[in-house]
């Protein structure tokens, strides 16, 4: 009986210690995300629009915690998350931070002179995020080749190989809901980064812990320095010509192009212009696009 009592006492003490440790972790966690929230509210680094968004959730503890309890993870596929203010959201600051990590990796690889190609899709803030990535690269001495409007991911892959870039960035969240956006990294072979590069880049991104160490510059200064260059029609033409080389039976297209009717639904996506262009250049005269999905 005495032995059972001692055993029960030991179990109780262990339970209390676990609860105390858990409570301490919760307090530390709460302090951490609240400290981050206050930092974003008070530090001059963050713009007024971001601060106003955060002020609106001042009474919503759960929302504050969800936005700040961790950093938005940079995984093997890059970034992906809900758009909004906070360390666990897609915004210009988390995009800059991720880009600084990628820039650090590129510099260590000696690839600054090759530059980086950047494309983006039709999601909310995609052009802005692409610009922020480009200006961070430029501030690190890495030239950014930025598409002048949205382009499909395969064309980004083509562009970075055509231009001889060391890396490429696509701002997209693929199939995720509209409140999401993302950021994918490609390497000089035109494919998404794979092991061991993906983990090496992740390590560089995770080492960027202070927003004030992230470099950026104005677009005017970047363009004047030759570190920001728009790309577009010249890449489109080269891409279309390469696509035409992949046609298996061009003679069949010539036979049916005048009469074949095609309905195309772009779903508001990046394929809208290039698909219609290649079909037109191949001679298809009856291509109908669903207006509500342009």
Regions found by a protein language model. Name each.
Residues 13-16, 20-21:
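Short polybasic linear motifs
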Residues 39-43, 111-188:
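Ferredoxin-reductase
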Residues 63-68, 72, 181-294:
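Gly/Ser/Thr-enriched, mixed-charge loops and adjacent short helices
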Residues 76, 120-122, 173, 291-294:
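Short, small-residue-rich loop/turn micro-motifs
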Residues 107-111, 136-145, 163-167, 211, ...:
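Secondary-structure transition/capping motifs at alpha-helix termini
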